[in-house]
Every structure is written in C-alpha cells, then in structure tokens.
Amino acid sequence: YVDDGSGDATPHCLAEALARYPRLRVLVHPERYGQSAALLTGFRAARGEWVATLDGDGQNDPADIPRLLAARDGAARADLQLISGFRKNRQDSRLKRIAARIANGVRSTLLADATPDTGCGLKLIARAACLELPAFDHMHRFLPALVQRNGGATICVEVNHRPRTRGFSNYGVADRLWIGIVDLAGVLWLKRRALRPEARELQRP
C-alpha cells in the first residue's frame, strides 16, 4: 500500500492493518506527490512478476483482480504486458462521465491505444514493463499508450465501479482538461519518437 502523504486517518488505519496482516507492506510519502508518483513507488517496491493496482477511494472493486488475472492467463499473446479495467457503468456524476467520454475518445484517437477507459485505476501490469515506463507527472493516465510504445501488448476487461461513499476527488473537470492537453501532446511526442532497435550478435566461425 502506498500512502501518498495522507492528512486524514489513513496512517493510523494502516498502522493497525500492519499489526493484523503480516504480508502487508506500507510505503509512505512524506508529502503528496500525486498518483503517478505513488504508482512508481509501488512498482519499484513490488516483488512479484505482475502488479495489480487500484485506487484508494473505494470505487475500484478488489474482487475484480481475479478477472484481470484470468484475462491474462487466457490471452494467447506472449507480449501481453497490461490488462486495463474498463468501467462500463461508471458511478460518477453526469458531468464527469461526459467529460471522461470526450477525453477518452480524443486520447484514444490520437494515441491509437485501443483503450476506452485509460483512467480506471484497476490494472494488472508486468513489473518488467513498469520499470521501463518514463517517469513524469500524470503518466498514470497514459499507461496503455506508454506500454505499447515500448513494444508491449495491452487488453481491456470490463470491471465493476462503485459509488464514492467518502472523501472527494482531487481531480476537477477544468484542470483535467488543460493539463490533459499538455500531457497528451507530450505522450504523442514520446510515442512518435520511440526507439526499439533490434540486433543480433555475429558468431565467430
């Protein structure tokens, strides 16, 4: 679990959980660095070959993780590196759903990542692919395109989405728009200039 500088009761709850669950590991940021930084911290600390991610607001359903694993195991692709959740029935406000639909459409068209819902926090990603990702703020919104940029395959799986019962979102529609435009241009630049050279070593006769 990555605590991104929480100012509420999260540290206390995590301390109690540590005492109760021996396998739990908690990584704490001294201040808020953002969702992308939290993901990078988790990726680097992970010990398994695959990493499952989900947001801490309770809207992602952990019970969907086996569904992602099943999709990975059932895919006939050796280059598969990312399984993304797709919140077909989002439990958000109408304004947020409309904004997300437009943003996803523009992003998917420009980046050609074939991902209808890149903002879903529920994902399963190969740790090796995680460690090759470029590190920049808001990169979590473009994981499918970034994985594809490095030569990995991605697929989407429909997942559950639950209503928010507490707290509030740190993402507004207006700030997402302008930041998203800048980030999209940057990712498009990265994707078009990706280098994946291949070579074979000559053997001595």
Question: Where are the regions that the model predicts?
Answer:
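Hydrophobic targeting segments
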Residues: 1-2, 181
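A conserved acidic beta->alpha catalytic loop
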Residues: 3-12, 58
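Acceptor/aglycone-binding surface of glycosyltransferases and processive sugar-polymer synthases
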Residues: 16, 23-45, 50-53, 62-141, ...
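Glycine-centered tight turns that cap/initiate beta-strands
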Residues: 20-23, 153
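Short linear elements at protein peripheries
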Residues: 124, 132, 156, 194-205
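A ligand-binding cleft/hinge motif common to bilobed small-molecule-binding domains
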Residues: 149
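Conserved alpha/beta core of the MobA/IspD/sugar-nucleotide pyrophosphorylase nucleotidyltransferase superfamily
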Residues: 152-159, 173
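Negatively charged linear elements and acidic catalytic determinants
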Residues: 190
